[in-house]
């Protein structure tokens, strides 16, 4: 079904179940723990509490935040908050993830680990990642690189990278 012909409620439902978002400004809820922030999407989807806890714990471990599940965003570094935001976006295994600078505030090793996780999700689950970035490392690892200038596409190139 075409999204431009969908009702608002259907669009909201489609976004909730099919699209993950990584915002450059994180948009974490400061009074919730890292784990509760990650669980939020699944709670809105109606996932049972036990399953939410299990999945959120596992994904936080995958992004390197094991042991920090009970910390609230103000108690985390910028890079840790970024990884909570990524975990929240991918925990429900959406079809598409829209990510604005997902490796901002991360050191190169952590950024590479995160890109490896994205590649794994793409290969195993068919998740498509649409990433806005200035990071050359992400650009090198992408399956397709679309460059914009002043809002216009100036190049659209298939690459040998793995993330797409």
Language-model segments: what does each one mean?
Residues 1-141, 145:
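ABC family nucleotide-binding domain
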Residues 144, 152-164:
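Conserved beta-strand-loop-alpha-helix hinge in the C-terminal portion
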């Amino acid at each position: 079904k075409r999204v431009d012909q969908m009702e608002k409620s259907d669009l909201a439902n489609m976004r909730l179940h099919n699209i993950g978002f990584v915002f450059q400004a994180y948009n974490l809820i400061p009074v919730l723990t890292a784990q509760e922030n990650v669980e939020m999407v699944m709670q809105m989807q109606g996932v049972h509490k036990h399953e939410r806890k299990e999945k959120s714990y596992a994904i936080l471990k995958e992004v390197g935040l094991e042991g920090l599940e009970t910390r609230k965003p103000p108690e985390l570094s910028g890079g840790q908050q970024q990884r909570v935001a990524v975990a929240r976006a991918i925990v429900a295994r959406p079809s598409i993830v829209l990510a604005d600078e997902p490796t901002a505030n991360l050191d190169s090793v952590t950024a590479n680990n995160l890109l490896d996780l994205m590649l794994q999700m793409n290969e195993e689950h068919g998740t498509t990642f649409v990433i806005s970035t200035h990071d050359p490392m992400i650009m090198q690892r992408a399956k397709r690189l679309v460059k914009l200038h002043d809002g216009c596409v100036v190049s659209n190139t298939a690459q040998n990278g793995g993330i797409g």
